[in-house]
Amino acid sequence: SLNRILESGTLKKKEHNKIKKILRLINQLNANFSQEYSTATTEVFTRLEDHKIRLLNETQLNNEQKQWLQHFFYDKLNGSTSPIWLSEIDNISVLEDNRIYLVVKLDEIDRDKTRYAIVKVPDRVFGRFIIIPSSEGYDNVMYLDDIVRFCLPLIFIGGPKCRYEAYSFKFTKDAEMDIENDSDYSTMERIAQGVHSRKRGEPVRVIYDNKMPHDLQKKIMRRLNVRELDTLLGTERYQNHKDLMKFPSCGHKELKYESWPGLMKPEFLSERS
C-alpha cells in the first residue's frame, strides 16, 4: 500500500512528496463519495415512506415502541452491549475492526463529572435493522445503533444518574497481507492465512460521526494511534452502508431485487492454483 511505501524510508524526497499528494487526493475523494452516498440514501428512505415504510430513530418513538424496546433489551440485547470504559483502554485498535462502535459520553447530573465508554453494536447477532411496532399506518424500522442509544440508561443502570450522548465510529486495520509461497497449501488456504494475519495490522482508516465533539475525536484518534496520512472520514450518523442490502422488505418483496447466487472460480478450488 502507499502507506507502507511511505513508511519504508527508502524513498527520495520527490517520490515521498508525490505519494503524500496522492494519499491526500484519495482522502478527498473518499469524503466526496461519502457525501454523494449520504444524499442517495436519504432519497431512498424518503421514497420508502411513499410505500409506508419508515425509518425511525430513538427520539421519534411513541410509548408503545419505547416499552417494546425495553422488553427487547431485557429479552435479547442485554449481555451483548457490555461497555468498555475509555479510561481503561489505551489502545482501541486491539478491538475487532470493521465493527460499529458507539463512544458514549456520560455527564453525571448531580456533580460535575464526565466519563466515556465504548459500546460495540452487536449487529452480527441481531442484524443491523430491527422492525418495531407499526404506527400511523407505517411499518417502522430502526437501526440497531439507535436502539442501543435508546437503551443507554439500561446499559449503565446502577450507576449515577447521567445525561447520555453517543457517537458512532468504526476503524479498518491495514488490509495488506503477505501470502506465503508454500506449495503444501492451496491458494485459498494461503489467502485465509494472510487474512488472519492482517488482523494484527495498524488502523489506517477511521470513519466517525461528524457531530462527535472535537475533544472526543482527539481521545479516540489518540487511542487508535492514527497517523497524518491515514484516512479520517467524518460522515453522517451511520456507517457500514453495505448493511442496507439486508434492509427488511416489510412485506414489500416487489421493492427488492432478486438475489444472485455466488460464483466460485474452479481455479480457486485447485490444489495446483
Can you annotate each of these PLM segments?
Residues 1-273:
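N-terminal localization/anchoring segments of enzymes in phospholipid and broader phosphate metabolism
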